[in-house]
Amino acid sequence: MALNYIWFFFFIIAFAIALGKWIITGDPMIFKTITEGIFKSANDSVDLSFKLIGIMTLFLGFMNIGEKAGAIRFLSRLVAPFFSKLFPELPPKHPAYGHMMMNFSANLLGLDNAATPFGLKAMESLQTLNPNKETASNAQIMFMVLHASGLTLIPISIIAMRASITPPAANPTDIFIPCMIATFAATVAALTIVSIRQKINLLQPVILAWIGGISLLIGLLIAYLKIFLSQVQIESFSTVLSNGLILLIFLVFLTGGMYKKVNVFESFIEGAKGGFEIAIKIIPYLVAMLVAISVLRTSGAFEFITDGLKMVFSYFGMDTQFVSALPTAMMKPLSGSGSRAMMVDTMTTYGADSFAGRLSAIFQGSSDTTFYVIAVYFGSVGIKNTRYSIPSMLLADFVGIVTAIFVAYLFFGN
């Protein structure tokens, strides 16, 4: 029911702000701007769904080969000791373990194109165990909130954007560690929030061992990149690692399929058909969500909020540099492309190496696009009652935002 009220209030807030602008400033174009944005977002939603068809068919085709080759079962057995504690509803060795692990791994490496198909497959697997098909299960909520926290090891696209902006950042990779800290804080917050709600004990030895091990690996990788590699080498390493792993996954699935005497071509076609069906199924959910977000954005709601915050912090004599980057943080839960545009606008206006420019990049890398994730993932399996998933995601996003601000002042503050 939370999504119902949020969707409604997006329109109410946008209309109230637009009406205020028209009455106070006499802006005759505000309603035209909002209406044009509505129709553009509706068309963009359909275009986005069609763009997803190719990616979905590709990865679900290979995923089907991997399942028949036994790769997903192997991955499920590997992570079962850890995931069985976080997802107690799932039976041992369930395929959903492997699908979720593939999704988290793709997210970790910044492989958005791969993460979405793997995540949708995970939701489909979890839905088979869901007793109430229109209400999100505990396992689905845990998966969604962890996914939306957006734990990413190497923010490749953000580094590339900082390098390509005019003028470019002197050191595009200097936001690497701050991004890692912010997104890690958001993920830990997401895990803690849902675990408290679902009464999961995070102090179990297995959970502590896995979280400690993952934290150690991340720390060692960060140390290696910062101590032994130059800026150019870091960018090269990131590109080779992320793209090389995609090809390696495909090769492992194909080799495993041939070894198991699976007809890999027919298996690919069989799995790929599901990608088309899912992409078409999510169109209504995407249209509904992206139109509501467009209404809020084109009404000027973000400018209204940031101007108000700047006045409040100035009144108390506090530093307001971070406020200039807040539009990126506010847009990120709503729209990935919108927040990316906000980040570019901030870097163009203030400079890529300015405090606001760097902080906007950290905001962009600190979490995933919450409402897009809700629309696509829950929409793909027909979930209508998302229960407490949205408040949990937004709270984790808030932790990521606050952490990003503190980290930015720690690394780049004057």
Where are the regions a protein language model picked out?
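Alpha-helical transmembrane segments of multi-pass membrane proteins, especially transporters
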Residues: 6, 10, 32, 69, ...
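Hydrophobic core segments of alpha-helical transmembrane domains in multi-pass membrane transport
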Residues: 7-22, 56-64, 149-152, 156-160, ...
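Membrane-core helix-loop-helix motifs of multi-pass transport proteins
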Residues: 126-218, 353-364, 369-414
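Short hydrophobic/aromatic segments of transmembrane alpha-helices and their interfaces
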Residues: 97, 134-137, 247-248, 322, ...
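Hydrophobic transmembrane alpha-helices of multi-pass small-molecule transporters
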Residues: 1-49, 194-280, 413
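Transmembrane helix-loop junctions in multi-pass membrane proteins
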Residues: 19-34, 67-72, 153-170, 196-198, ...
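Residue-level preference for alpha-helix termini and adjacent loops
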Residues: 103, 108, 145, 153, ...
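Membrane-embedded alpha-helical segments and adjacent helix-loop junctions characteristic
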Residues: 31-128, 231, 260-349
